[in-house]
Amino acid sequence: MEQRLAEFREARKRASLVAQPSTSSQSVQTSGAKAEPAAATPKTATGWLTRFLKRKANPAIAQAQPNQPQEAGQQLPESTAVPLPSSCRQSFLTNITFLKVLLWLVLLGLFVELEFGLAYFVLSMFYWMYVGTRGPEEKKEGEKSAYSVFNPGCEAIQGTLTAEQLEQELQLRPPQGSRTSPSCSSYP
C-alpha cells in the first residue's frame, strides 16, 4: 500500500511539472490556492480526481452536479479488477438451462407431430443422463472432493486396499518381487 502511495505521489509530481506550462496559458487566477490544484492535475488522472478538479476550477458546475464522496479512500482506483458478482453468473447459467429445456420441449413437440416422439424422448433421456452425470465445469481451486470431505488429508483407511493390492487380489498383476504370476507357473 505504501509503495502504491509513493508511486501515486511521484506520478503526481511528474504530472504537475508537465501541467504547469499549460496552466499558465489558461485564464489568470487570482489566488495561489486555486492555482495549486490545477497545476497538480496529472494527465492520466481519471474519475473522481478529474471531477474534483473541474469543480474546484468552476464553482458553478460544482453546484449543478450532485454531491459525490469527498475522500479519495472511499473510491476504488480504476486499475483494480473487480470480479463479477456470482449472482450474474448464476443467472446466466439459469437462463442457459431454461433455454435448453425449452428447446427440448419444442423439439419433442415436433417429433410427436412426426410420430417419432418416443424415439426422440428415449434418445434425449440418454443425452440428459450424460449431461447430468458430468460436471458443468471443472473442479474449482480449493474445492473439496467428496472423498476428502469425509477423509481430511486423504489418509489410508484401515481395512481398505490400494489399487496395487486390489490388482494382486484379482491376479491381474504379479506380486511385487516375483517375475511370474502364481497362476502362470502351474501351466507347463
From Swiss-Prot:
One of its GO terms (biological process) is rescue of stalled ribosome. It comes from Mus musculus. This is SAYSvFN domain-containing protein 1. The gene is Saysd1. Disruption phenotype: No visible phenotype; mice are fertile, with no differences in sperm morphology or motility, although the cauda epididymis contains slightly less sperm. Residues 1-100, 122-188 are cytoplasmic. Ufmylation 'reader' component of a translocation-associated quality control pathway, a mechanism that takes place when a ribosome has stalled during translation, and which is required to degrade clogged substrates. Specifically recognizes and binds ufmylated ribosomes when a ribosome has stalled, promoting the transport of stalled nascent chain via the TRAPP complex to lysosomes for degradation. Residues 1-10 have a biased composition (Basic and acidic residues). The lineage of its organism: Eukaryota, Metazoa, Chordata, Craniata, Vertebrata. Residues 1-43, 60-80 are annotated as: Disordered. Residues 101-121 dip into the membrane without crossing it. Keywords: Cytoplasmic vesicle, Endoplasmic reticulum, Membrane. Enriched in testis; predominantly expressed in round and elongating spermatids. Residues 86-100 are annotated as: Middle helical (MH).
